[in-house]
């Protein structure tokens, strides 16, 4: 049995689908105690742009600040508006400090906010919460 000659072919990457013009979408804001993550999707749920406090060069305890959430929201909104997005619905999730400031960041970047929805999951007495912090 002869061996096949070794070929130096790289694996083929799938090309990203170019979004032509997406006029409206949904901004999902997940604000945890340690970070804020913003994902802007089209109405069917495909992610168009995203940003987090860590992506815009905040690290450590500064990631959990309201200012970091504002900068991250502006970063995600600029990318989405360059693809033609004009208006968004906002879904807020989580108890973090960046909830309201992320909404302000989306507005200041030029997106029109049509609705604000709070989709924070509330337990029906599920897992035991973490212990109280004593400073």
Curated annotation (Swiss-Prot):
Claim: Iron-sulfur is one of the keywords in the record: no
InterPro entries given in the database record: Ribosomal_uS11, Ribosomal_uS11_bac-type, Ribosomal_uS11_CS, Ribosomal_uS11_sf
GO molecular function, one term: structural constituent of ribosome
CC annotations in GO: ribonucleoprotein complex; ribosome
Keyword list, A-Z: Ribonucleoprotein, Ribosomal protein, RNA-binding, rRNA-binding
Domain of life, per lineage: Bacteria
Gene Ontology BP, a term: translation
Keyword RNA-binding set for record: yes
Pfam families: Ribosomal_S11
Family recorded in the similarity comment: Belongs to the universal ribosomal protein uS11 family.
Cited function: Located on the platform of the 30S subunit, it bridges several disparate RNA helices of the 16S rRNA. Forms part of the Shine-Dalgarno cleft in the 70S ribosome.
Quaternary structure and interacting proteins, as annotated: Part of the 30S ribosomal subunit. Interacts with proteins S7 and S18. Binds to IF-3.
Protein name listed in UniProt: Small ribosomal subunit protein uS11
